[in-house]
């Protein structure tokens, strides 16, 4: 009887691309260079996702998904010319200017959002820069929503320092003011304000003690280096934002960017992953454009470190996955919403 001959045992290991060092400057607290961010974006896709997921698990072990609802409380008629925005008065998009909603209308919408599972309620108004009387009216809305037990967020345009303080006194938890893109590409998107105007507003918000919500848009015709520049700008804010919404451009007929080339879905996932790596303690939010991504790409975004979504059938004036679709997606992925809380978060380290 002869014994069977077996092949010698061999061990196979996955070979990952050498890790990109977070740059000596970053380790010394000097911030992220555009080159260092670009090197992350250029990593092989699976290596990048592995690193982003490792970072995410280290800082967000509970693995929950924050559900935020965004309501346009004052729609249209904005004098700005942001090339992506259907609410600009300069573009013929079919969006009609409307007055500020009443306290009753807003609280009804906020209660419905809470009943559907949202924990944060965001209010957007299409102003370039609100007047003091607008801030007084918004303060009433903020207090009313806060009384429902929801976290509050507002995006109202450029703020002065005393206006930010008034919003803080009203109970505002977060203020959204996106950088949109890198400073080098900003003038290609909007010419009615300067990049520094956005940075100044963010400083007023931070000085008032309000948490910062700040991100950008992918797919506006920007080059890869501009995506790296945007992430570097966000990560180098001191401290970096508590919430970082990443939008995939929704191409709206009548806007200058309506014919922009759609962003490659995997490139969008890359931006999510690098946002997670460079801002590990931030809530990285899947924002506008989720509907065009599909379930599989959204799942990759969650794997890459996204842990917040805008939840509800509409985002300002553009469509969003309906609540039932999101509920089913999260259930399929085994993801759960964040427990409700109204306390503000501590600032993220730079």
UniProtKB/Swiss-Prot annotation:
It comes from the Bacteria. GO terms for molecular function: 2 iron, 2 sulfur cluster binding; 4 iron, 4 sulfur cluster binding; biotin synthase activity; iron ion binding. [2Fe-2S] cluster binds at residues 122, 153, 213, 285. One of its GO terms (biological process) is biotin biosynthetic process. Pathway: Cofactor biosynthesis; biotin biosynthesis; biotin from 7,8-diaminononanoate: step 2/2. Pfam families: BATS, Radical_SAM. The keyword Cell membrane does not apply. Keywords: 2Fe-2S, 4Fe-4S, Biotin biosynthesis, Iron, Iron-sulfur, Metal-binding, S-adenosyl-L-methionine, Transferase. Its cofactor is [4Fe-4S] cluster; [2Fe-2S] cluster. It catalyses: (4R,5S)-dethiobiotin + (sulfur carrier)-SH + 2 reduced [2Fe-2S]-[ferredoxin] + 2 S-adenosyl-L-methionine = (sulfur carrier)-H + biotin + 2 5'-deoxyadenosine + 2 L-methionine + 2 oxidized [2Fe-2S]-[ferredoxin]. InterPro entries: Aldolase_TIM (IPR013785), BATS_dom (IPR010722), Biotin_synth/BioAB (IPR002684), Biotin_synthase (IPR024177), Elp3/MiaA/NifB-like_rSAM (IPR006638), rSAM (IPR007197). [4Fe-4S] cluster binds at residues 78, 82, 85. PANTHER family: BIOTIN SYNTHASE (PTHR22976), BIOTIN SYNTHASE, MITOCHONDRIAL (PTHR22976:SF2). Belongs to the radical SAM superfamily. Biotin synthase family. Homodimer. Catalyzes the conversion of dethiobiotin (DTB) to biotin by the insertion of a sulfur atom into dethiobiotin via a radical-based mechanism. This is Biotin synthase. It comes from Acidovorax ebreus (strain TPSY) (Diaphorobacter sp. (strain TPSY)).
